[in-house]
Every structure is written in C-alpha cells, then in structure tokens.
Amino acid sequence: MGCMKIFLASKSPRRRELLENLNFPFQIVENDIEEVSSEKEPSKYVMDLAFKKALKAAENIKEEAIVIAADTIVVVDGEILGKPKDREEAFSMLKTLQGREHIVYTGIAVIKLPEMKHSVDYQETKVWIRRLEDEDISNYIDTGECWDKAGAYAIQGFGSLIVEKIEGDYFNVVGLPVAKLFDLLKREFGVKWVGRGFEYKDKRLAL
C-alpha cells in the first residue's frame, strides 16, 4: 500500500488541534495571502478565500497530495467581521456582537495534486452572545483570546463565558466544520474513515 500526504494550509492552532484529535495525519504548509475577496455574499466570500489559500499553498507542493484550507468570518447585520487589528477594534466588535445573534461562516477548500481537482463548500452556525458590560468586554480582551479570531472571540476558551447559545455546528465556530470537511473528502476525493485512521483509495495517509 502506497502513501498519500495531506497538507493543511492554515496557521490556526484550533484547526490543527481538531484534526490531530481525529488521528488525521497532515503537515502544515504556509499560505500567506492577502485575506480580501471581491465576493459580497458571506458564503461565497469564505469559499473564495479558502480556495485562494489552498491554491497558494499548492504552488509549493511538487508531489501527489491533498491540500486543505479554510476561512472563517463572523457576519452581523450583513457586515463581515474578520480578525481585530488592535484593542479598539476588538472592543468595537464585541460591543457590536453582545446581546444579539450573529452568524459564523467557514469556507473549506480541497485541492488534489497534481491534477488540480478541487472542491469547495461552507458551513454556517448561528451564535448568540449574552449582554455584556464594558468591563466584561475589557476583561475578555485582557485574556488575549481575541487576537487572530474572527469576531474577536474564541468559543472554546474564556469565550464560553460570553456565549449564550448556538444553533448549528460547534466546530464550525471553532474554525473547522470537521463533519462537512470529511463528507467532502469522502464524496469528492475518496478519503475514507477506517477505524481509528483514514485511507485514500488504496493508499495510506501518512505524514
């Protein structure tokens, strides 16, 4: 049985941890792109950015492999919130989100090399942040969790103290809708879940 390599085009420790928890073998590959898209519809926006990340990462891979990328945003009243640039922006984002519903979108993209077969999909989850005093927002920012997070919060950390409820896929809010991803990998690319491991057709997935 031969081997197939999987590359994750993401620097997110949350996405890495989610895949590691599944015993899914992968390597990290850089995908430095400007995270901007001309798409206005949130679902198309995240799928476009996820595909751009996967495409950029694929440029440096010269072997048979599968490349996975993802992009997550928060949308409230039609406005897209990305990652805060500074404390003031983080405070503004959390102030906007508190006491109301917003939607988390994550786009996923998969490219099979060398033939460049690709597929994209997305997941959305509704999230309600409880009402927060300014002191609560400042305390949360002081935890340091808001950086590098769409919408300036992390649901799996201290952010669990400010989230009132969710409707939909929890892991999507963390940053990677794993059920949606593995459905795509199986349906479009032949990656199978076998016991406590995974296979690609007649090949073993390996680092």
Swiss-Prot record:
Xref: Pfam families: Maf
Classification via InterPro entries: ITPase-like_fam, Maf-like
Catalysed reactions, semicolon-separated: dTTP + H2O = dTMP + diphosphate + H(+); UTP + H2O = UMP + diphosphate + H(+)
Catalytic class of the enzyme: hydrolase
One cellular component term from this protein's GO annotations in UniProt: cytoplasm
UniProt entry keywords in alphabetical sequence: Cytoplasm, Hydrolase, Nucleotide metabolism
Major localisation: cytoplasm
HAMAP family, sorted: Maf
Protein name: dTTP/UTP pyrophosphatase
Annotated organism of origin: Caldanaerobacter subterraneus subsp. tengcongensis (strain DSM 15242 / JCM 11007 / NBRC 100824 / MB4)
